[in-house]
C-alpha cells in the first residue's frame, strides 16, 4: 500500500562507454558492463577517469596486482570510495568513512573525524612568554 519505484537488480551490457548508466549516479542495483580490449588499457583508464561528473564509488576487479595498483593511483579522483576486488556498496557508516567528490559531494568522510574538518576553521595561536629583545633572525645572517 504505498506508491513508489522499485528497480529490480539489473545488468546492462553496453558498447558505448558514454552510455547513460555509465555517466550518471544511479542509486539502485544496476551494473553496467563495458567490455574493452586489454591492449587499450592505458586509454581505458583515462576514459574511466573522464566518463562521469560523479565520483562517489567505484571498483575494479582483477588478478594483475600491477594493473590494480595503477588503476588505484590513476583513478584517485574518480571515486571517493574505491574498492579493489570487492563490491562497491560495502561502506557502513561508523565502520568505514564514506563520501564522494566531484558532483557527488565535497569528499567529506561521514563516519570519521575527518568529516568534522568541513565544519571548523583551524587557527594557530602563538603566545610568547619570554619577550624577544632582538628583532633579527641570526640564522639568516651571512657568515
Model-derived features: positions:
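Conserved C-terminal structural/oligomerization subdomain of aldehyde/semialdehyde dehydrogenase
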Residues: 6-143
